[in-house]
Amino acid sequence: MTNYLLEIGLEEIPAHLVTPSINQLAERMEAFLNENRLKFDKIIKFSTPRRLALIVEELSDSSEAIDEEVKGPSAKIAKDAEGNWSKAIQGFSRGQGATPDDLILKGDYYYAKKHVDGVKSEEILSKVGDEVIAKMTFSTYMKWGNNDFLFVRPIQWIVSLLEDEIVAFDLLDVTANRFSRGHRFLANVEIELKNANDYASKMPENFVLVDAEHRKAEISAQILALASENNWQVTLHKDLLEEVNNIVEYPTAFVGSFDPKYLSVPAEVLVTSMRDNQRYFEVYNQEGQLAPNFISVRNGNAEHIENVVLGNEKVLFARLEDAEFFWKEDQKLKIEDLVAKLAKVTFHAKIGSITEHMARTKLIAAKLADIAGLTDEEKVDVARSAEIYKFDLLTGMVGEFDELQGVMGEKYALLAGENANVAAAIREHYMPTSADGQLPETKVGSVLAAADKIDSVLSFFNVGLIPSGSNDPYALRRAVQGLIRIIEKMNWHFDLSLFIDQFEGQNHAEILEFVKARVQKLLLEKLDRYDIVEAAINSSNFDITNMMESAFVIDGHKLHEPFKPAIENVSRSINLVKKAADIAEINPALFEEDTEQALYDAVISLQNQWTYKPCEEKFRAIVHMLAPAIEAFFDNVMVMAEDLAVRDNRIALLSEVVALTSVMADFSLINTK
């Protein structure tokens, strides 16, 4: 058993590509080793902005020898009319190093038994360049030199060591060897690695912390230490910490400051300038107030750190000057003037202006406000917020810091005298901004956010701008996922198709399937029964909250004893009704058996307020009241009676059963085997 080191040295990789790149390299290496039957214990990952590296631990000296059967020609073409071996069978056996008589007939085909010897690990690993590195894919590529090879960034060097032996291969003009490189500025020299096992200890000596998790821990410790020394509070934002970790090889944290006068600008603006634009960690005093300081991390040691501090402060000064200017100038603007100008701002060339988008959103929001049971005052706030909620797009601050759209809208709205509900809705209508992002907290904001997303999705689908594959340039999947989460949180019950049907366009079915796919995705993140999820999302109305609740309720009962017979009896009813060409009106006078009347009575008793019953109550009624009546009906009644009137009447009765149960789910899609 030996250890193998692979290091790919590169020009600086963009921070957001470092982690996915090293993960992909490890996955491809694992697949490559498995395909070549080369056993190993584990793969350890290392990454910095300039290198992607792996150590494969306890690698076998050679691949496993195996005996395998290779499928050959069909028996139908194995021999000619005289019973002689055909050319096809002779060619196959020759290719396998055998004779036709050595072949085995299994079923309709001939097979050759073949012994495959193990291959030395060195020979297998010499293919890593072509079979692992060259096959990597990236969202962003570069091409260099006079070749068509594409990679995330130009390759500068490759280390390939099996213990102390070089496993040589060429990739373009780079030959794998044992020489790595140190830090670009602190140790810009070749580093000879005598053994693969020296990598983790040798690189830090040359100012490269190759272990990404160790480097991240070091950054965290340094930041927390500086905060403690200065009696500050600091949050190690996960995404920011990940980004900073992927732009440095040898981190040194430092403290910077800015003029306290800028604290008159909203904290969100200052934080955006520091965190999002400059990758600084903002700090707070012990009262939780933003301090005129920041903590940043350089890619290097503490030498001449004072110059680094001054340089960073100078860059931040320019940004804060702009922010202060926009903050003062924007307050001179009137909301109504900005709203009027939105008529000349394009939402999308095929859809129209932002003003038109806002007008449609206002109509949708009014209907949602009724559904949500908002008070008259809240409905007034919904209408007002829908009239103005995009005005901040034309402010100087949002023009400079587009991350602050909505945030600045709230602040400027409050300064202009709008009430807190309207102002909050302006900020909240963008929520959630990510798959698990924060949801609106106010009712008015929830209605506006949902309405805005509904109109966006319907508008883009209406003009044929529909996401396909991974291509979703207008973030419609995120919009729908956010819409679903808002509806679920607010516990709104309404049929989404009512909004879609009132919208012009021919893509209604596609929209429903698109939304359904997002509901399915969210449910499958929490439930493991695909069939139950499918049943729930294929209920007879498009009530998203009902879909979600139904899936969880049904899943919660799947192990209960009555579950299987109940589902089977309802499914049988569904399948019989599906086969019927027409459904007649129920005529109780045509009932011939008591079980028909009993089932009819059960249906009638449940129909009252059925739609508004909680899903748990619905399912219990189906299992304990309706299903036993269905079972007794099937046990005592021949549905397909010779008398057509009686047959149609029984189908009609079952159709009422289906109408009831399908409000919750299509139970015929649930597997009970």
Swiss-Prot record:
UniProt catalytic activity: tRNA(Gly) + glycine + ATP = glycyl-tRNA(Gly) + AMP + diphosphate
GO biological process: glycyl-tRNA aminoacylation
Any one GO MF annotation of this record: glycine-tRNA ligase activity
SUPFAM superfamilies: HD-domain/PDEase-like (SSF109604)
Compartments it resides in: Cytoplasm
GO terms under cellular component: cytosol
Enzyme class: ligase
NCBIfam families associated with the record: glyS
HAMAP family xrefs: Gly_tRNA_synth_beta
Protein name: Glycine--tRNA ligase beta subunit
Gene giving rise to this polypeptide: glyS
